[in-house]
Amino acid sequence: MLTLVAVFGCTAVAAADLVVIVNPGSGVRSMTRDEVAKVFMARYRQLPSGTTALPMDLGPDSLERKDFYMRLLGKQLPDINAYWARLLFSGRASPPHQVANSAAAVDAVAENKGAIAYIDKRQVDTRVRVVLELDD
């Protein structure tokens, strides 16, 4: 039994601390969970500063992606994928752009004024601004 606790304890420690980042030139200093959710679900097309939003998703097999949607919306990836399938079919919206990993997300956000992404907190650097921390 102690072994199981140790294994599960390690898994919990290994889960990434996620943060939402934007370009420092976006004019955004912080965002609420609700604002971030609306940007990533295409309900808001702009960041709070009025800059056109360019949300970035990590790859479909990314653990950070799974954790992000669970922490932010309480939804599993199949639910998120079904949501986007409906919106794509109706022509109402397109899903966020995909990048390979947190490092690529940082690069994309640093290069695009309206970009917004979620990453492993350990990947944050001076080229981006953290606007929300997502705790377990």
Residue ranges: model-predicted function:
Residues 16-136:
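Exported/periplasmic ABC-transporter solute-binding proteins
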Residues 1-9:
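Bacterial N-terminal signal peptides
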Residues 10-16:
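Sec/Tat signal peptide C-region and signal peptidase I cleavage site
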